[in-house]
Structure formats: C-alpha cells, structure tokens
C-alpha cells in the first residue's frame, strides 16, 4: 500500500518552476508494539519540527530495508524489536536549501521484547513511550504516520484474533 501526502505534487511542481534540484531518499521505520501499546518518540529538530513520530531513518549503503528499520528502532529508542511483517510505503517531500527531497519510507510491523525504551538525544529524540492506539494516533505529528499506524495496528489486531501474534516472524 502506498500513502502520499497531498502537497507532494505541489512541491514538485514548485521545484521545477524555481530551478530546485530533486533529490530522492529512502528511509525505513517500525510500528513497534508491546502488549498492545505503540512506541512513539518525541523528536525536536532544531528549526525544522518538533513532535511525536514513529521511529525511522535513512537506509545505509548495503543495508536491506528490514535491517534499516530494526537498526533505527534500536538507535532512536533503545528498543530491541523483531519484525513481524511489512506494512507498506509512505511518501512525502520537503525542502532543504536548494533541494526538494522526495522521500519514500518503508514501514514494518514489529514486536518489542519489553516496555523499556531509551530515547537517544544524538538522534534528536527527547522522550519516548508506549501508548494505547488512540493515544498514539492523536499524538503523532504527521498524517502519513497516522495512516501507517492505523494499517499496522489493524494487522496486529488480525494477528491477535487469529492467535498468531508473536508466533511468526518474517525476518
């Protein structure tokens, strides 16, 4: 499933008119669940944005998407997680200096091994915690992350209903 922010095409159009360079980027992240609650992080980027987000980050050279997602969850939140399944891809764009970055984010449903989390200030994370679905949904800053959360949580509920949550891992 592909989710796209509504204003992405406007930004691309504006970039073409303003002679900005288009840059493509790929990130991966996780919807991490422990005992029905979802891990969220409070990020504070200087002069960019501040708010609650799902853990995600840039794919490093030679990395598979699932490896990036697991590494980013560990780096940003200090959480050891296991991938249950691939959820989908979201897209958004943003401006940096003379570039318009068009970003794809691949998302995975994950299971954590404990409630313990440790936000990493080096990753601009100043707080973290596990929240009930409706709390996490309303905390999240970005609509595309809310949509991914909804998809992932529905997958989680389906797996629980079938008594499969925690029994099968794809990676």
Predicted regions and their residues:
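Acidic, metal-coordinating catalytic segment for phosphate/diphosphate chemistry
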Residues: 2-29
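Thr-Gly-centered strand-to-loop micro-motif
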Residues: 54-56
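Charged phosphate-binding loop/patch that engages nucleotide di/tri-phosphates or the phosphate backbone
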Residues: 5-14, 138-171
